[in-house]
Amino acid sequence: MTAAQTVPAPAAGSAQPTVRRLIVYTLLFALVVVTAVGLSGLLGRLLGAGTVLVAGDVAGLARSLAFTLIGGPMAAALWWFVWRLLDDAVERSSAGWGLYLTGMYAVSLITAATGVLSALAAVIGGERLGWQLSLSNGLVWAGVLAWHRWMWRHPRKSPSLIPDVPTVVGAAFGLIIGVGGSVTALANLLDTAIQGFTASASLGDPWWKLVLQALAWGVGGVAIWWWHWIHDGGRRLTTDFADVALVVIGILGAVLLTVGGVGTVLFVLLRLAFDRTDPVSEILEPLGAAIAAGAVGSLVWAYHRTVSAGRSSTTLQAAKLVTSGVGLAAAATGIGIGVNSALSIAATPLAGDGIRTLLLGGISALAVGGPLWWLTWKPGVPPEPTELGRRGRRVYLIAVFGLSAIVAVITLLVIGYRVFEFLLDDVSGGSLVDRTRAPLGLLVATGLAAGYHFAVWRHDRSLTAAATPRKRMVRKLILVAAGDPEPLVKVAAEVTGASVTVWKRADAGTSGTAPSGAASSGASSGTAEEAADGLSGQLARALEGVAADRVLVITGPGSRIEVIPLGSD
């Protein structure tokens, strides 16, 4: 009779399960993608049967059949193997399962939405060919999306790790698509109105087709955003990833869109007032897109600012810092362009119209970015004590100072190169000011930014150091005293920050230091208080600068004080 051999289970912390999950989930991901590509190809041929796009495409048909008939069964078998393993809680809590579902959910959502919306826009535009392939791609990937959403929401086998990431990814993608489509639709509508005002003819498709095509993308994106943000509860998520997405997309992206749109509108208005060298229709060309970007961006920004108000203080600070950074970048750009233009005008009083246009662009950037930075950063208001100790503010100050300093150093090198090139070049290629005005403008802007933020960083450090409690130089202090020890205990604790233990002298009655009872029966209270104050001041001076784990302090006889540093226990 042979004994059965027992195969030992993998030891705790073994890399075998991790490697196995990496291989299995990577292979499953690839097989699902291959199968979806094959199915979409076959469905596209079915929808586009009889068209020129699919007629005679033998290679495409062979590829689709191979991907579907070979990759499909392999993907199904591997998925069934993985699905049975997910009865184990360890498998459900693994990073591989969570990352696979998140990655496939994101890929299928993006591909399905892009395919369906592209087909819808093509149909609105009156295209007879091409939309079939987009629709087939969108429908197949929509099925993949529904399948993985079912697994993600499964009551027993849903991932335990990063379960909320698909919600955040879906909401972010929907917001981006919705904002892009809305801006494009509104821009086309405004451009049509502006062209009608300027009586300029437009070529191409009718304006309403462009508006409806962009509106289809906008409505589709808003629907995706609503489904994940409202229906799936994305707005209630308070995880770190959700907060990062809120700040980066909802705040930073919206602020960039708003600042760019408002700045462009102001630039167009300034050109209409002071720089009409070009035709009015050409000057007004970017106005529609700028108004649309500013309007939609401000709405998105205002909404997400309201949402961020209910988040943690760290999220609020991050939203403030990214907004301040955008305003700072716009203001610095305006300063640099302004210096560049001013130097050009000073060197060549009869400068061309291009310099005037450049100057108006700098004024627009400064007029938008400056107030935004001032209202957000509030340089005239001292920061809250709780804000000084936060890592985000320190990182922001160091990052702005470091980046500005790096750009300033590079700009100095460029200026030096231009100066030596001017001195050594025999052929005149313009004045020295013309050669150096662009890097000089950049140097002034980055120098101001670096200098200011370095000064703020130094000031914050001094405030933090002043508010930081003194480091305890003594852990424990033993006070040997006669009489009332309370004044001495208070002084010792204030000077050293240590815990104080009082030992009463046994020879209090015979020492020169009168005990409290003797003082009350014989000496006057005024003399006793003066003696106590003098002894307290003497003790404070004696303990100043003493550093030891334990300190023994012996007072008496009389005004004698002896401080003895001791070693650790």
Per-segment meaning from a language model:
Residues 509-533:
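Intrinsically disordered, low-complexity terminal tails and inter-domain linkers enriched
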Residues 526-556, 562-569:
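Preference for solvent-exposed, low-hydrophobicity sequence contexts
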Residues 412:
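Aromatic- and Gly/Pro-rich donor/ligand-binding loops
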Residues 1-406, 416-419, 424-425, 430-483, ...:
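Hydrophobic/aromatic interaction determinants used to assemble and anchor large protein complexes
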Residues 1-8, 474-475, 513, 521, ...:
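Short, intrinsically disordered terminal tails adjacent to the first/last structured region
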